[in-house]
Design a protein with these regions (language model features):
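Short, hydrophobic-biased segments on the C-terminal half of alpha helices
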Residues: 35-39
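Short capping segments at the starts of secondary-structure elements
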Residues: 10-19
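Glycine-centered, phosphate/nucleic-acid-interacting loop/turn motifs that mediate DNA/RNA or nucleotide
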Residues: 45
């Protein structure tokens, strides 16, 4: 299972969902759990999403 702390550690620069998945859990091909976690973190203000580039980053 992917944790918020791990996601924040990987977001040293803006990254797309697939790039995050490959750094966090390359054996899992589905990004559903990661996307759900990212949306919860965005709602809490812990990460932000740039719609123009399609990348996630720290606020």
């Amino acid at each position: 299972m992917i944790k918020e702390e791990d996601v924040l550690a990987v977001l040293d620069k803006p990254r797309a969902v697939y790039a995050l998945q490959m750094r966090l859990d390359p054996s899992n091909k589905s990004t559903d759990a990661l996307q759900e976690l990212l949306l919860r973190m965005r709602a809490a203000g812990k990460v932000k999403f740039d719609i123009k580039t399609g990348k996630w980053s720290r606020p």
